[in-house]
Amino acid sequence: MVSEAPPFWWRKPDWRAWGLSPFSFLYGRVAGHRMVHGRRASVPVPVICVGNFTVGGAGKTPTALALARAAKTKGLKPGFLSRGYGGSLDVTTVVDPHDHHATAVGDEPLLLAREALTVIARRRADGAERLVREGADLIIMDDGFQSAQLAIDYALVVIDATRGIGNGHLVPGGPVRAPLRTQLGYTSGLLKVGDGNAADRIVRLAARAGKPFFSASIKTLGQEDLQGRKVLAFAGIADPTKFFRTVETLGAGIAVRRSFGDHEHLEEDEIADILDVADRDGLEIVTTSKDYVRLIGHHGRADELLARCRVIEIAMVFDDPHAPELIIDRAIAAARERRLREGWTGKTLLPSGEK
């Protein structure tokens, strides 16, 4: 999978997108075939997948966290399943946020593990089985929508209202991961995040396909005292400009911006540059939670940078506060039907309100 999205993916199709069309066609054939014909392992608990149609960030991790919090209020024990992208471990592992570092397990699993039981696995079926053994009664997959490795009971596809699906072309000519018709066929619900009209076309397509639609926004937690402060902001996420806009909405003036690749671990000279520029210009340093956890256990002056960083924590807030519970209930109901079809025996979870 492409890890860095070139800027032309997010603009109107140009000669590069059209020139790469033959390769996009081949990529789409393979990705679509995998989604349709992949052998999906089945586990005896409900599985919710939080995915997106495109390469890059759309808010999957904060969405997964919001669902886990809702699950816990219902008395469930959710468990996160992640591939551990950016980490070096290639064995199925229960993530310990106190002992593991991002270099081993990836940055997103560390954030997830602060909230609930988290397992990383190269084979998602292995990870799901481990979560069940560890006592999870609801699995929330952070990404993996196109992988076709695990039977999914509810696929919530997250789409950024300001970016949509970019130029609409498949990889490598655009950011789309598999043919949209195929992806929509496996979509249970769509979540539009933020304001903007870039996602309107795909929302209409989903509506015509009878898919339920939810909306949400990303809210910052605290940091109101940044109003009027001059800061150096750095981010190594899929869309750093989104983070910079968030900092500006808090009233801070960004004097210096530093953008890095998604999941990128900073080199010693990059850490030193951030600290030296902030010292020279008298700036506070702000960053994302993902960038912060990647610095833990780092070398050189990383501890100094950790001590000086102000982390902008965010949360996904659904417009309808009951939406997460509704999604969980639908996943539970779908899992019950799947278990009956497949002949599972034992305790069956029921949506809230049923006995």
From Swiss-Prot:
InterPro entries: LpxK (IPR003758), P-loop_NTPase (IPR027417). GO terms for cellular component: plasma membrane. One of its GO terms (molecular function) is ATP binding. Transfers the gamma-phosphate of ATP to the 4'-position of a tetraacyldisaccharide 1-phosphate intermediate (termed DS-1-P) to form tetraacyldisaccharide 1,4'-bis-phosphate (lipid IVA). Its EC number is 2.7.1.130. Coiled coil: none annotated. Signal peptide: none annotated. It comes from Rhizobium rhizogenes (strain K84 / ATCC BAA-868). It catalyses: a lipid A disaccharide + ATP = a lipid IVA + ADP + H(+). It comes from the Bacteria. Pathway: Glycolipid biosynthesis; lipid IV(A) biosynthesis; lipid IV(A) from (3R)-3-hydroxytetradecanoyl-[acyl-carrier-protein] and UDP-N-acetyl-alpha-D-glucosamine: step 6/6. ATP binds at residues 54-61. This is Tetraacyldisaccharide 4'-kinase. Keywords: ATP-binding, Kinase, Lipid A biosynthesis, Lipid biosynthesis, Lipid metabolism, Nucleotide-binding, Transferase. Belongs to the LpxK family. SUPFAM superfamilies: P-loop containing nucleoside triphosphate hydrolases.
